[in-house]
Design a protein with these regions (language model features):
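Ribonuclease/tRNase effector modules and their secretory precursors
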Residues: 1-91
């Protein structure tokens, strides 16, 4: 599936988090992931939160389906407690 993103958000995330939407999101989605719909707010679109692994570290990606593309909104490494919760679901 094609990945799209806002170039400015990609650049910010690359500088501040060392994660690249263009390359790293595809790596995460090529492995085992768990995905849940984000119901916290009305975003005007269905946003999904996926957790998976990038080079052995757990990553969370917020994204939405746009046509046939997966549009990445944010991406970051998980914190300790958060990773424990996601690992329970991934098992």
């Amino acid at each position: 599936m094609k990945t799209t993103f806002d170039p400015a958000k990609r650049a910010w995330t690359l500088v501040h988090r060392g994660l690249d939407f263009a390359v790293d999101a595809a790596k995460v989605f090529s492995g085992d992931t768990v995905t849940m719909v984000d119901h916290r707010f009305d975003y005007g679109e269905v946003r999904q939160i996926s957790a998976g692994f990038l080079e052995g570290r757990m990553v969370v990606i917020v994204w939405t389906q746009r046509g046939t593309s997966r549009h990445v909104i944010s991406m970051r490494y998980c914190h300790g407690k958060e990773e424990k919760r996601w690992r329970k679901i991934l098992r």
